[in-house]
């Protein structure tokens, strides 16, 4: 793969700032941006936790940004639920909504408006669904997802590697040849390089789809 010159940090800073302003779900006026060696840092304040996540995603979308560091704080209004109320609200979410996690598999704790999820589920998509189901609750400043994975199906490392490699070829036929898949037990390691952060995320998501995977170490780098 051909490597070209990296874009200067000052240009990336301008691009990230413009992308934040372009994102309708983000109030960019109170968000500061700095970039060092392609690594963007966002600081300042937002009104909700989902807005904070949207800001971080916006920065990651900018071509040339390799890492996005989070120094954004959530600034709540006056009528903020307490930790006990937030805990009850989070548990109600799992009781009353069609969240794709096994019943009674997730436990919730809230301290200083930071919500912690514990428990075990078979798939990564269920782990993510549990987190997404409560991340938008009013008054939440952050979510720690400590849910572990206990797959209901297993596969031999060679079989798992072959399935992931085949899926990568289907999803990204041109770039998949630059991606190396390693499997150690139930843990997958991705190495190599791709042009965009979106393709890097796509490769990781593909690895998570393989039955039996409990961890994905994404070491892929971006070419510019």
What are these regions (language model features)?
Residues 1-224:
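N-terminal targeting leaders
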